[in-house]
């Protein structure tokens, strides 16, 4: 057993230990598995990793053999990571947190998994999420992940934070990094609640082929790391051109030209990350940072609108705790000390989406898109994309959406509500997305009727 400590170890630390012989890839995987057993499956039972890669130790042994022969596949060879339950990882189930897909087996890898496997990184397992990523901290097939910092707080935003398992696993050092996925803010919310770095890419920068979709116009891969240096390591591997566009709506649609990833990425992300505090200060000097008033209790007009957003009432006033505002002020002072400007700003993109104040429109009333389009984008397109995902995967047991009991996509959520109620936990908030489920089920049923 190696004495190397993986807690809070960065990718560079892990690679250095591997290169020096202080630890082997097998010992790294074993160390992470011990942490998972101690804190995820027992003790505080954080419940972040829900599907394990039984080949992880064998893959680590392969990495060690490559290292002994100086035949490494890349800078992440031997580095363990996790991925959300919405990623296809060949041979593992890919339930996306839904009872209906509990036994769906991935016949191939998602693009990001494929890239990491090709580079020698080792998948520890898949992380928790609500059913089909529809929500945030609602419990799905595997329940939900809990906060590694404070049992009284959520590890992601309740309404939109479906990559909660990835956030917990990465923050708790159950792997070097995690792969989340995002439609609204499902990648950023767990990062915010767990002091992590998250990268939400522009369309087409990271291929989403092989990821379960929710709303294909918005779905993106979102890596989670503990530092920006680690983020650069991951992006150097997964930001790459993908010739196969199936399952990636923006790259497959013919109307808007999306540049190839190789045309928009730097030669090396690692080379653009400052290596010390002095270099970081130079990067920040002269930059202008905006702090939205609505998030620090400084916008009296926020939250007074009477409009409705896509799924119901939105645009409520955000009441931020003083302890959080204090942290805003500390961060602002640090930026100013580095030579940056920090200014209070309005956030019209939010106001115009949520109708959060008198006179502001919502996405439904602004006139840029019709209510019919919103229905088709969020419901009909979701049903179509689920069917296409299943067909592209090719599991003979679940070859398409037509053979799926549509109600189990949603009623699994109801089953979890029954379990929660039996524990004496209030279920009112758990059922927050019930109307969404009803609408999605209707779209699935309509799709099945046309097949």
Give the location of each predicted region:
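An N-terminal boundary/leader segment
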Residues: 1-68, 91, 330, 337-340, ...
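Serine-dependent amide/ester hydrolase catalytic core
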Residues: 13-16, 263-274, 297-301, 309-316, ...
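Short, well-ordered beta-strand elements within core beta-sheets of diverse protein domains
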Residues: 13-20, 101-104, 219-226
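Short glycine/serine-rich loop/turn segments
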Residues: 42, 76-221, 249-255, 292-294, ...
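A short helix-breaking turn/cap at a secondary-structure junction
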Residues: 197-323
């Amino acid at each position: 057993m190696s004495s190397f400590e993986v807690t809070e170890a960065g990718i560079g630390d892990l690679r250095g230990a591997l290169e020096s012989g202080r630890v082997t890839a097998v010992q790294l995987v074993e160390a992470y598995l011990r942490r998972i057993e101690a804190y995820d499956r027992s003790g505080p039972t954080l419940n972040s990793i829900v599907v394990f890669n039984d080949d992880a130790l064998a893959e680590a042994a392969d990495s060690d053999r490559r290292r002994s022969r100086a035949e490494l596949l890349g800078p992440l060879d031997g580095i363990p990571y996790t991925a959300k339950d919405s990623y296809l990882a060949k041979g593992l189930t890919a339930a996306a947190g839904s009872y209906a897909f509990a036994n769906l087996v991935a016949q191939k890898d998602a693009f990001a998994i494929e890239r990491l496997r090709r580079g020698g990184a080792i998948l520890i397992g898949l992380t928790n999420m609500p059913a089909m990523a529809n929500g945030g901290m609602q419990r799905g097939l595997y329940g939900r992940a809990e906060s590694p910092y404070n049992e009284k707080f959520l590890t992601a935003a309740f309404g939109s934070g479906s990559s909660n398992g990835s956030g917990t696993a990465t923050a708790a050092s159950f792997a070097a990094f995690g792969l989340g996925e995002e439609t609204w803010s499902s990648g950023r919310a767990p990062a915010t609640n767990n002091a992590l770095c998250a990268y939400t890419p522009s369309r087409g920068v990271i291929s989403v082929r092989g990821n379960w979709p929710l709303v294909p116009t918005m779905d993106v891969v979102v890596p989670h790391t503990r530092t920006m240096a680690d983020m650069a390591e991951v992006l150097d591997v997964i930001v790459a051109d993908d010739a196969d566009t199936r399952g990636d709506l923006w790259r497959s649609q013919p109307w808007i030209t999306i540049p190839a990833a190789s045309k928009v990425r730097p030669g090396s992300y690692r080379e653009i990350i400052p290596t010390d505090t002095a270099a970081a200060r130079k990067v920040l000097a002269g930059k202008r940072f905006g702090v939205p008033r609505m998030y620090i209790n400084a916008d009296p007009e926020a939250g007074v609108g009477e409009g409705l957003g896509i799924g119901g009432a939105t645009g409520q006033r955000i009441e931020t705790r003083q302890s959080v505002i204090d942290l805003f002020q500390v961060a602002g002072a640090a930026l100013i000390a580095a030579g940056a400007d920090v200014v209070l700003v309005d956030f019209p993109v939010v106001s115009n989406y949520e109708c959060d104040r008198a006179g502001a429109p919502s996405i439904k009333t602004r006139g840029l898109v019709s209510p019919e389009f919103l229905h088709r984008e969020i419901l009909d397109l979701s049903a179509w994309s689920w069917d296409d995902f299943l067909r592209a995967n090719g599991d003979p047991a679940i070859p398409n959406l037509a053979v799926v009991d549509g109600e189990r996509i949603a009623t699994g959520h109801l089953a979890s509500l029954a379990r929660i109620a039996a524990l004496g936990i209030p279920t009112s908030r758990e059922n927050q997305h019930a109307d969404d489920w009803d609408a999605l089920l209707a779209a699935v049923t309509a799709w099945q009727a046309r097949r």
